[in-house]
Structures are given as structure tokens and as C-alpha cells.
Amino acid sequence: MKITHLTTAILLALTLSACSSDDENTSTQPPVNPEEPTVPDPEPETPEQPVPVPEVYLDENFDQMTEIPATWSMPRSNAGTVYLSEGSLFLDGRANDTQMTSVMLPQEYQKLRNYRIDMEFAYVERNNGGRWGSIIYRAADHYAEPAFSPYYQFAIRGDATGASGLELALRQPTNAWNVLHKSAYKENIDPTKTYKATVIVHGKRVRHYINDELVLDTSLPYSLDQGGIGLSTAGLLMRVEQLKITEQLDALPESNKVTDIIDHRLPVSMAPTLAQPAPLTGNASVNATHIAYQLDEQLNLLNANNQKVMHLRDYLNDSNRRTLPLLTVKNENTITQLKALSTNYDLTDFTFVSDQADLLRKVRLALPSSRTALDYSRHTGLTHSRKDIVQIAHNTNSSLSKIVILPSHLVKQEVVSHLQRLLITPWASTNTTTPVSAAQILTTGVNGILTTQPDTFQNLMKSMAPNTLLRKPLITGHRGIPALDDENTLESMLKAIEVGADAVEYDVYITKDGHVVLMHDDTTTRTTGVARKIEEMTLAEVRELRTLGKQRQIPTMDEVLTEVTKYPHVVNFIEIKSPKPEIVPAIKALLDQHDAYDQSIVISFSGAQILHMKNVLPGVSTGFLTNTPTAQSDIVNTRRILDATQQYSSTFNPSFGGLSKELMTLASQRGVTFWPWTFRLNKEDFNRMYVQGTHGLTTDYAHDSSNLIVKLKTPAEITATVGKPVEISGQTTTQVGEKTTYIFKEMLVLPQSAKYTQAGQAVTFSEKGTAYVMPRYNYTMAPNYSYTLYAAPVKVTIQ
């Protein structure tokens, strides 16, 4: 069997597009800290260096395999049989509970050392619950005595919940086992289910997973300079439905933790990150989680006056540090020095900053696990136009970043929300010292703020109500709206939009004649009743299908884009289900055709497809679909999340189970955004995660959110009378867009305002003068679940 290769390509820059804003801007306040242009406006970045895409050595589903290849080996000591049947590989080890039945892959895999093995399997029958199946890796060749020993194996017992349910074991040349690690899985292996077991090994580091959930992370005691791969059973019949072997390019991190930053426990849900430039004198504020430095070629940390503060190595060695660094990198020599330093130090929990997208891309390629932020704070020529917003998103993604630091004049709610819909994490940069300007910035919903005055922002947020939402959680219609119409149909997408969804998610495959079509499963059986593989059909054949529910046609992505682009505020969440790399350029062609880059992002469970995206569609955001890590510590789980998101320069899109407020808060301080799925009848989980400020929620029931109040509109200025409670006439807007006149009687009075008294939430000024207030609105979703919105500051002239 030949080892196949995924090809990589660098294509031309994306055709930029954009859209008009759907958010109204009624503020008459002056712009926050306008700055003079100091650098030229950015051009769309065309990446010079491709992201390395791992080679796929084997991807076999056994459908077309009629006999076991001659290059595959069966050990002579096999107790049972290995055979093919009904499109699957079977290892029947029931003949003996302890003597193995194994199959070894071709000898050519011996030359490999660093790889990922994914096996989809089921235990059809077992002699007892203690029997097991396994993945063999780092095995010797058939010339060894005994053959193929020594090797490591990931063994999974039928009764996987036992203390030895999962094992990492070393098979020794003496035919004895050395069990290196034991652990229990959360459930026993159900004979009616198919599971996925994964081994990722690089150097002496290894990770084991079941169904993409990490179950072991350790270092191997012996490197075993060999690469053999195989499968094995003892005392059970194992069916293997899919076997995939992929090159592992990146080393697995040695550290399992991140910096333990201070949790200020603010009442604001998922409060924005506060970062502070390194002060010229004295210490940084304890309210800042990040400190910004310049980084020179000798890896010295410099303040804004280019004065040395300390060496990066000293910063890393400070065990009492509770802050994270923002390090501005200016040239490739610095990257070379960072690469050398990374052999002894873990730089995963650092953020490297530059205003050059190509330089940041080089940082990420040199340090694949690092985090980067594109600094456009001085690009004052950019506008809030559709074209410029897409350009910002494009260049942020091309730089392999998720964070972009905006120029002050673009720190507007309509710009911020558009970038967030495109899975970009926008930060503000400001030198403001006034509470009014700080309040203006906070109500834009930015994810982070780089400021010389973090205390001003922190104190303001401390005075807000519990579960304050400064940024609206986005509602994504899962496959449209399956609760009301058939999934992955055009009608379902349009219905989701009708009830107020911010985005529509749909799954795509590519037909054998090259058309991108919507389908969740790789077969059409479940949704249409016709037992065909979607990628073995032509478009004409797909056109003949009808859904079982409402007899809907299976749409093409072309048809969906045609309709969705009529709603500029709605985003296409395009989930790549196909394993075929050719679907990515096909998606690019459709986005080009419809000029839909301002409304489109791509998500996938496949890391290979996401990396392929970085070369073919480098300007389009990606989301990595996965599960929430399950370690007992939020510090460790945050590290797991960073390992996933920073590797793929993607958002974190997990199944919502196990996703806690504390974990999301800790990871969001590092620029991670959360897009959990799928909420159905579990309304309490949805309500909980909404009031916690989750960035986006994917649901089958988008219509349940239609009446949520999501926006407040108030005048920029009013007059009030001394001694009378202040009332402000304004407007509320629901998720579906319904506007209602509302009299605001509750408000937050900002510091430096005229004297006032407060009875309950009613505010009465006791002297003439000027004040600034933030009108507030509290909405109750259900018992025990409510949130508070604040409007932008209103100037009050008291007479």
C-alpha cells in the first residue's frame, strides 16, 4: 500500500467583500481618543508561507477492500482470525482470553515516528468484561524476536469503567506486559455503539483519546526508535469500520497548565480582558490580566520608552507571576530567538503582537502552539465599511490570529459585532481616563481592552448588575431549525432567519461531479430513506431525493448562499463533513461567486480540513468542533483548549456538556471564544449559558430566543429637573427585531456626575449640573435566569 499525501497550495488573496451594518449608532459623543495616522492603511494580505498540512498515510473504511492486503501481517501466534466482511475489518480474538489476535500494517510504517492513529470500532461480542481491543504503536518489525516486540499499546477493556478499563502498556521481548498507566473511562463499551480511539505520539510524548476526549497525556519511558502500527484483541470480536493514520507535525506540549491569573469575579458575564502597557514607573495595576511589552532581538522586555524591564527568561522564571504578556515582535530575528528559547520554555500562554500580518504568520509557523494578535490600533484610515471590515477579518485570519486590536474610531458596536459574527476577537486600544469614555467602549461589546487605565474600566464593571451582558450571545440555527422544518433544507434555513437567528449552520459534502450539497450524514438514509452515499451520487441524482418529513429537496450550497446573502446580518456557519480536500476549493469558488466573505465562516471536526483552509481560504475564520476537556482542574482544561484552538487558529466549538462558567472565563481571557452545540429540549442549559455570556449558542430551537431583549436605544442627551426621578424614553429590540418604546427608570450613574440620591433603582439629582448615566434593562428568561443590558452613556443636564 502506498503512502498517500495531502497536497498544499497557496492561492491568491480572497476577493474582499463586505456589508452594510445592521446596528444603529445614535451616539453624539466625540470619538474615543482619536489618533493621527502613523502607518499606512493595510492591504489585503496574501500569505507567502503555507501552513504545513499533515500527510495522510492511510485512510481506509474497508468498503472497497475485498481481501486483506498481502503487505499486512498476521503474527504466527494469533489465537483467532482476522478477516473482512460487509465493509468492515474484523479481529476475532474470542478463541483465547489472553493470547492476542493481531494484524500489523505494512512494513513501510516502520520509518515513521510521529503520527496520529484514529480507529472507529465496535465490540461485537466479548467473552467477559475484562477482555480488550487495542491500538499498537511504535512496534518493532517482523524480524524482531519475538516478532513486532517491543511495542506500546492503547488497550480498552469492555468494562472500561473499571480501574484498569484503559491501559497504556509496553509489550516486552520477554512476552510480558509492563502496564505503565491505568485509568477508568466514563462508560463501559456498549456493543450497540461505535467508538473512536485515537493515539497521538510525537517523540516521547503520547496522548490517548476516546471519542475525541483526552483520557491519557503522558511521556513514554522509552522512545523505541521504531514505528510499527497494528491492531489487536484478546477475548472479544472487534469490528473496525475506519482506520486513519496521519502525520503528526507538532510536538505535544510538556506542560499541562497555564498561568493562574487572578479571577476578579466581576458581575459582567465573560467580561472583556484588560491589558495594560508596561508602566514607565511603579507597578502595573492588579486589575490588568495582561501586561504589554516591546520585545527586542535579545528577548529583552521593554516599556514604551524602550527601557529594559527584564529579560524574557526572567519573566518566565517568575513563579509568582499572575499576569500574561503581550509581546510586540518587530522582525524575524526575534522569531529565531524565540524558536530557540522554546526548546526549553513553554510559550503557549503568551500573546505575540505585530501590525504586520505576514510577520505574525511566521511567528505561528515557527511556534505552532503560540497565540498572536494583529495590532491595527494605528490604522486610522480604515472605515466601518463592508469592504474594510472584511479586510480586517481577512488579514487577522491570514496572520493565523484570532485577536485584532482596532483603531479607536472603529470601536463601535456595529463594527465590533460584525467582526464577532465572523469569529474574530476584537480588542480596543485606548488612553482614556474618563468613566464616560470607558463606558462607551464597554457598551460596544469588545472582547478586550488595552488601556493605560485598567482601574477605570474595572471599577465601572464592578458597579454593574449580576449577569450583565455587554456583548450579545449569538444564536445559530443548527441545520436551520429542525424543530420546525426538515434539517439542512433551504426552507429550514429561511425559517431560522425568520425567527431571528444570527447564523445558520449547515453541513456540506461534495458530489462525485463536484457540487457542494447539504447533508449531515455521509449517507442519505436517515433523512430521505434512500440508502446511498452522498459523495457517490451526482447532483442530478441528489435532485431526485426528498426529505422524509416535508418532502423538501436537498439544496446545494450555491442555492443557500443565494438566499442567505439577502440578509446581510446573517452568517453562514459552513460545516465541512466531507473528508475530501477538494471540497475546500469548491467552497472558495462559491464564496467568490456570491461575494459572501462578510457572511461566511467554516467549522469542522477535521483538523486536516481546517489546516487545508488556512492555505486555500486563509482569510476565512474557522471553528474547531470538539468536546469539552474533562480534567478536574480548570487550569489544565484551559491548556487543553489552547492546545486545540491555537494549533488550528480557530474558535472553540464544543459539545456544551461539562462547559462551566469558570472554564469559559479563564480561557476567554486568552482570546478564546466559545460556540457550544447543540441545545435542544435542555432549556435550562441554554438559559444558563446565555446569561453566562457564551459567545454563540447553536440550537435546534432558534425560535425560543425570538423574544429575548438584545438591544437598547436611548437618546444621547436629555434634560432633568432637580428633585424629580429621572426617566428616559427609549426603545428595546428583540432578537427577532421587534422594537418597543420603553421608559427607562433604572440607570447607573457614572462617577464625576452631579449629586444624586437613589431609591431602589430610581435616580433623583439633588443639584443642578451635568451627569452621565447608563440606562439599564433587566430581562428574565426563566426562573433563576435573568440578565441585564446597559445602554451607552446618556448626558443629563440637570436644571
Predicted regions: what is each one?
Residues 252-332, 373-472, 476-479, 625-721:
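C-terminal active-site rim and adjoining tail of enzyme catalytic domains
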Residues 2-9:
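Sec-dependent signal peptide recognition
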Residues 256-388, 397-411, 420-422, 513, ...:
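Metal-dependent phosphodiesterase/phospholipase catalytic core, i.e.
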Residues 710-799:
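Extracytoplasmic soluble-region selector
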Residues 44-262, 353:
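Extracellular glycan-recognition regions
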Residues 9-58, 214-215:
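Bacterial Sec-dependent N-terminal signal peptides
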Residues 115, 193-195, 570, 769-773:
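Exposed beta-strand face motif in extracellular beta-rich ectodomains
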Residues 356, 441, 453, 478, ...:
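Conserved, mostly hydrophobic/aromatic
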